[in-house]
Amino acid sequence: MKEVIMKKKIFLLTMIVGIIAVIGACKKSDDSTTTAACSSSLSTTASGTLTGMTSTMGVDNMTGTYNLAWYGATPTAGCIDNVTAVSSMINQSAVPSDTQNFKYQHIITSSTSFTELLTWYSDNNSCATVSGYHATSYTNFTVGDNITMATAPSGYPTYGTKVSYKDTCFMAKGVTDTATAFINAMSNVSGAVTGTELNKEGSGSTYYNIMALNDNHSGTTYDWFYLGPESTSAYPDNYSSDDSDVMYQ
């Protein structure tokens, strides 16, 4: 699980850089219409329900916020403060160098959308002092067929639901100068100013993936969410040990 999640973080960061490379060709932030459209479509407030995912209870729904399960653990409120984990993320340039804790979350924002949010914190072991964040909004969420697998990577179920969603909006903000420098170091991102939120149109790409739920997994009170390796060309037929996520709420 350690290697799975670490590789996924590298994959996500690479994907985000690719997204930004595309949106660099979009209208500049001084176009008020473009900025407003992006801002209005990117919410980090949980609202609504995504329906139709397969689960241990048959068909189930997703609502609220799901947090990354790091090293197989379920840290309080999703605050990942494992020193080894944070150090590894810094060494791989996946988070700013002043990061002490972080959260990686999927937030259901309507019946057809969700937001992927990575927040960095500069305080020690509490996730109280935000140093920065970046988020991507996905809309046009659509549920397809259910699938099963003969086997799946360790920690993942042998079932899933085909889903698709569109990359609509990207935003980022550095509260500390270190976080701002990290954002500006992303490919085709410039002009981020400490304390000011940067909003950009997304790539517009449609992604194909598989998702599944597992209620009260392993006798715990948590509901678990599994997200496969997304693609712009075809639905995956299984989860991946390199670039899939295990999340909980």
Residue ranges and their predicted role:
Residues D81-Q92:
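Short, charge- and proline-biased low-complexity linear segments
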Residues S29, S39-S43, N82, V130, ...:
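General secretory precursor processing signal
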Residues M1-I5:
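Short, Lys/Arg-enriched N-terminal segments with co-localized hydrophobic residues
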